[in-house]
Structures are given as C-alpha cells and as structure tokens.
Amino acid sequence: MQSSGSSASSSRHVSIVELLSTPPNAGVPSNSAAPSSSSRVAAQAQVQSQSQSPKLSATAAAAAAATADNFGNGNSNFGQAGAGTPAGSHIHHGSDAESISSISSASTTSMHCPLERTGSGTGSGYVPGPNSDVPISPSLSAVDTLHSHSVSRTNSESSFDTQLSRIHTTKWQLIPLSQLVEQNKLIFIDGSISVEEAFNTLVKYNLTSLPVENSPDDIDCLTFDYNDLNSYLLLVLNKITVNNPEVTRQCQLGHPVPVGEIIKLTPKNPFYKLPEQENLSTAMMILGSGVHRVAITNQENTKITGILSQRRLIKYLWDNARSFQNFEHLFQKSLKDLKIGVLDTHTKPTSRQSRVISIQGDELLIMALFKMHTERISSIAVIDPQGNLLGNISVTDVKHITRTSQYPLLQNTCLHFISVILDKRGIEMGKDSFPIFHVYPTSSLARTIAKLVATKAHRLWIVQPSGDTPVDSEKDKRSGKLIGVVSLTDILGLLARHQTEFKRVDPLAARRQRGSIV
C-alpha cells in the first residue's frame, strides 16, 4: 500500500484507470454526529426513537474462525497497538485492523484490483485482549462436545478476564463499564489519510473498525470498517454510484481518496458514547438494538477510554456466566422456544426476527459484494438451488481480493470463493479448516452462544437438517435447508428484554436507522 506523498502514486493510478476503462460486465445495476448518553433513560429514548418500519433484514458482521478449545480465551475488539503505527494513524487508548499495499503498475492487458496488500498482518478493531478478530480455525471437537444444556465452560486464561471473574457481582446489570475497559491503547486514524492507508491500519492491528477523527481529541467521530471498504471497491469498479461526483471521479481516476469521505457514503448509526461509571444494563440496551459498538468515555465525557462491541459483551457474559444470576434458565432454552432468529416459512416473521438474505452458489462473487452493499448487511448465506446452506461470505472477506492477482475471483462463483477461503485457512493453520456457522431450531441458547464465541462470528445460520440427520447432531459438517439466522443483536436484545428494565428493546431499531429496513 502506498502512504501519503509516495512517489509511486502516478504509476499505480494509471493501472487503476486502465482497469476502469474495461470494467467487468457482471450485470450489476448502478446504484452523524453521535449524541452523548450518560443516562439510561435518555439512551433508551434515543435508540427507540429510530424504530419505524416492520420490514425485516438480516443482521451481519464478519464471520471469523477462532479456536474453540477454550471458550474463555480471546482478544478484545481493538487490536493491540504496536510499534510502527502507519502514517496517518495515531494511538489514544484502543481499536481494529488488516493491510493494503500499493497497487502494482502493470500492463493494460491485466485487470487490477483497487486495493492490494503487500504483507500479512494481524489485527481487528478496537481492543487487544478479550475481543481479537484474528481468523483462526475452530476446533470442531471442542464445539461438538459442548452439552446443549450446560453453562459450564473453561474460564478465560487471560489475566484480564481472570481479574473480572474475581470482582463482578452476581448481578451483571450493575457492573460499571469501567470494569470492561482494558488500559490498552485505542488506535484512531485521521480522516485525511487514504482508504489504502486506513485498510493497512486495519490489517496491521487485526481490527474490524477504526474511529476516524476530523480533529485531535475528536470524540464525535464515525468509524471506518469493511463495509466502507466494500463500498469503495464497488465504486472503483463502477458498480455503484454515489451522490458525490468528486469522490466518484477520484475513485475512477485511481487517485487517493480520503477515508473521511468514504465513510460518509455508507449509512451508519450514531457513535454512541457512555461514561465509564454507567452500568452494563444500559450498554446491553443499546447493543441489543442493533448498534455494533459503543464508546466508553471518562466521567467528564471528554476522552474515549475504550470501546465495547457486541462480540466483546457476549464473550464477557459467556466467560463469566456462572457468576451471574438467572442465566441458566435462558441458556437451556432452544432458539425455537425463545422465538429469536427462527423463521417459520408458513408464518409471517415477527418484528424481532432477522430476515435471511442469501445468494446462489453459482452466482458471481461480485454480485454477493453488491448484494451486501445494497442490503446494507455484512454477511450473506450461500445456498444451492434446493435452498441448502453451502457456506457464508462476509464483508471482511473483501481482504482476500485486494491483490491484483486475486481480482479474477470477482468474476468467479461464490462457491469457488468459499473453497479459496477454506484452502487459505488450511494453509495458514496447517490443517483443514471448516468452521461450523450453523445451528438448528432446537439448539440451545448456550450452544449457540458457545459457537458464536468459538467462531468469532456475528451471526449463525439456522438450518433444518435433512431427514437422515439427527436434529441434535452438531458433529456433522453438513448443514441442511436454510430457514433462518440468529445474530449477536438477537441474543443481546433477548437478554435486555428478559433481564433489564428495558423491556421494549427492538433488535431492528439500528437497522431501520441505517436504512437497512424500509
């Protein structure tokens, strides 16, 4: 990737212009300030005021594989800051990552991808420790041996989670947010740096998102994530149109585009902030409404001290479930009994269920990226003509098509792309990798959460097993007919309604605000 002011920019830009002069014909149609919330009541009103239409859509986020041998192990959602911070990024207190390198200038006979990585890196947004996004294959045996009605797990081996286990009370709702903030550094990036540099920072620190500052100590900032990267890729490839002619022109000429401009193109929720003395109940209400992360500030609300993501919260509750009241009863119930995520094809979905969005395995990968953009989701199920689940494509998988040599993947099938991803994981891990991203309507909430923690996914697809597959068999890599999806939002919304004072939390509120549901 090219840093600002690089002398190699001109040749790279020529190669992009050559690419744009012969765009692939995939048949694709053209196409906030964050309010401060220190009060639970004010926060609830703010989130619930966004809820409008009942039409449904699937929640999404990047599905990454992770070791399941010890569900208590994991890294936080910010990526540890290290030496060699890329130009344009600077360290405050916590953030997310992955890397883009410069686009090599080549002959006009070669197709070029707008982003290209030069090296491997690890990183995922916002916290080093309990919420890392490092893609690692899960141990299927560990997932398979989970008893569907057991809340027992191995506690986290990290000193951070061990410390939390010693200090929290039996009422998780009263735990102050300060107890979930690690004193590690957050990584912020400046809005003036290029999209390539921003992607480099994501990769470097193995993050999924980064706060973008317009000025030093700006706490009312938007975030850059893989949805923005997907939009940028589609814009460069002339597959979408936006209402900013100058940004469109710069993208299609191959000129560097400030990340601060790109993040404005994708609808986002406000950057919610809660003071560190606020308790977990309020954060649960906001995250259970579909907001993916909240910023935690000091008492004066002048400085961000950490970020709490949906995945970090789920992992924290799972690691410490034995210490909390009233979890066992909910954890033993099935998804069907809880009425979350499961879609009955004979009845109309409720306003608290997610709509399944899928694509056929023989459709082109570029169409999957386009569909995720237009539906404003971050993952999509891949199915066969009979509706059986074949796999999953996440918006974070865009990182696998940032090299010039990987560009032909866009014009290949979704099923082929899934095989490429699995092969890549197998090479990196030295063994076969086949993370199980599905559950059944009869799967318990405990098993579902365990799989979400083990795979570091944001959602699991719900399938109806074939007649010859026992409904309680979790060891079979085969899935079944896709009938639904259950997400982190669904689960956090359920916990908020059942175990906090916020009984009317709507898991689709944030999606409506982003325009994902009309």
UniProtKB/Swiss-Prot annotation:
Biased segments, Low complexity type: 1-14, 23-54, 97-110
Record-annotated disulphide pairs: none
GO BP term, pick one: cellular response to glucose starvation
Keywords tagged on the record: CBS domain, Cytoplasm, Nucleus, Repeat
Record's keyword annotation contains Nucleus: yes
InterPro entries per the UniProt record, alphabetical: AMPK_gamma/SDS23_families, CBS_dom, CBS_dom_sf, Ssd23
Localization (cell): Cytoplasm; Nucleus
Residue segments, region Disordered: 1-54, 77-140
Major localisation: cytoplasm
Signal peptide per UniProt: none
Span of domain CBS: 181-242, 265-323, 350-409, 429-501
A cellular component term, taken from the record's GO annotations: nucleus
One annotated GO molecular function: protein serine/threonine phosphatase inhibitor activity
Lineage top rank: taxon: Eukaryota
Functional summary from the UniProt entry: Involved in DNA replication and cell separation.
Family, per entry: Belongs to the SDS23 family.
PANTHER family: AMP-ACTIVATED PROTEIN KINASE, GAMMA REGULATORY SUBUNIT, CBS DOMAIN-CONTAINING PROTEIN
Protein name: Protein SDS23
